[in-house]
Amino acid sequence: MGAELCKRICCEFGTTSGEPLKDALGRQVSLRSYDNIPPTSSSDEGEDDDDGEDDDNEERQQKLRLCGSGCGGNDSSSGSHREATHDGPKKNAVRSTFREDKAPKPSKQSKKKKKPSKHHHHQQSSIMQETDDLDEEDTSIYLSPPPVPPVQVVAKRLPRPDTPRTPRQKKISQRPPTPGTKKPAASLPF
């Protein structure tokens, strides 16, 4: 059961046999607690014990070949694990087909290289980095541009015409200035 679970996890998350498994928070996960769980399928109940053991050994070896070296040694089954990982050309052939199935995965990494993340100051798992990159892309679309500093608007006054427009304004401008009043603004130079 542990080898089957190990194979499923390796295939699902794309980890290689030498890397330790990590959860979403980057902590290492151990599968040793799943090694001794008996299989839940009921197909072995009606068969003879001798035939069932041979089938189980062949099936276990095949699963271990697919899984590589047991996902970094987390599979602590007996000698069949050691025999299965030292198959030579068979193991390499199975691994090469396994890697070909995972060929689309590197394209995600190439996207990551094109758009480098700003958060390279600490180590993260690849899943967390991909989600961070996606979050940055999504939020950058909705962010407004930086505020533009206000432009200094200098009010320029146009000079007033020398002659008043109305007859009343003419009359007022012709009066001599009194000590309490100021000269009209039209006569002040700017």
UniProtKB/Swiss-Prot annotation:
Q: Where in the cell is it found?
A: Virion tegument; Virion membrane; Host cell membrane; Host Golgi apparatus membrane
Q: Which InterPro entries match?
A: HSV_CEP3_betahv
Q: Where is this region: Disordered?
A: 14-190
Amino acid composition bias (Polar residues), ranges on this chain: 30-43
Bias kind Acidic residues: ranges = 44-58, 130-139
Q: Where is the lipid attached (N-myristoyl glycine)?
A: 2
PTM info = Myristoylation and palmitoylation (probably on one or more of the nearby cysteines at the N-terminus) enable membrane-binding and Golgi apparatus-specific targeting and are essential for efficient packaging. Phosphorylated. Phosphorylation does not seem to be required for recycling to the host Golgi apparatus. Packaging is selective for underphosphorylated forms.
Q: Name one GO cellular component term.
A: membrane
| Highest taxon of source | Viruses
Biased-composition ranges, Basic residues, are: 108-123
Show the ranges annotated as biased composition (Basic and acidic residues): 80-90
- What's the protein's topology in the membrane? Lipid-anchor
**Record key words, sorted:** Host cell membrane, Host Golgi apparatus, Host membrane, Lipoprotein, Membrane, Myristate, Palmitate, Phosphoprotein, Virion, Virion tegument
- GO BP of this protein: viral budding from Golgi membrane; viral budding via host ESCRT complex
Role, per record: Plays an important role in the cytoplasmic envelopment of tegument proteins and capsids during the assembly and egress processes. Also participates in viral entry at the fusion step probably by regulating the core fusion machinery.
* Similarity remark: Belongs to the herpesviridae cytoplasmic envelopment protein 3 family.
Assembly, in brief, is: Interacts with cytoplasmic envelopment protein 2; this interaction is essential for the proper localization of each protein to the assembly complex and thus for the production of infectious virus.
Q: What is the name of this protein?
A: Cytoplasmic envelopment protein 3
Source organism: Human cytomegalovirus (strain Merlin)
Taxonomic lineage from the root: Viruses, Duplodnaviria, Heunggongvirae, Peploviricota, Herviviricetes
